[in-house]
Design a protein with these regions (language model features):
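A short beta-turn/loop motif at secondary-structure boundaries
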Residues: 10-12, 45, 80-83
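A short, acidic/glycine-rich surface segment
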Residues: 6, 36-41
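Vicinal oxygen chelate
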Residues: 18-21, 40-109
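Carbohydrate-associated surface elements
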Residues: 29
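Short, small-residue-biased leader/transition segments that mark boundaries at the very start
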Residues: 1-2
Length: 109
């Protein structure tokens, strides 16, 4: 099998997610379950397509502190729980060339 799919619902974010892992790369598909949720509003405003890119990091809080010190605007000033039990935080697209950027850390590593 070339890829593995894992699905789950993120009720607080009003989305369903599906992950496809190909080697070391993981692709996450998002399906809005509510037009008033963050992804539903994004689709209404910008249309379907790429929502964000994500990067795995070690030391998420330290990374957030580092990029904030460099002038990057943070959406999340502290990590929060995301899909697959990861700790996540988002950087504002105005600071990342118009691309919503997610930083992820596996708390089990």
């Amino acid at each position: 099998m070339l890829f593995r799919s894992v699905s789950q619902s993120r009720y607080e974010q009003k989305v369903k997610t599906a992950f496809f892992k190909i080697g070391q790369t993981k692709i996450e598909l998002l399906e809005s379950t509510d037009p008033e949720g963050p992804v539903g509003k994004f689709i209404e405003k910008k249309g379907e397509g790429v929502h964000h890119v994500a990067f795995a990091v070690e030391g998420l809080q330290q990374t957030l502190d580092f990029v904030a010190d460099k002038g990057v605007t943070l959406i999340d000033k502290a990590p929060r729980k995301g899909a697959e039990g990861l700790n996540i935080a988002f950087l504002h697209p105005k600071s990342t060339f118009g691309v919503l950027t997610e930083l992820c850390e596996d708390p089990n590593k």
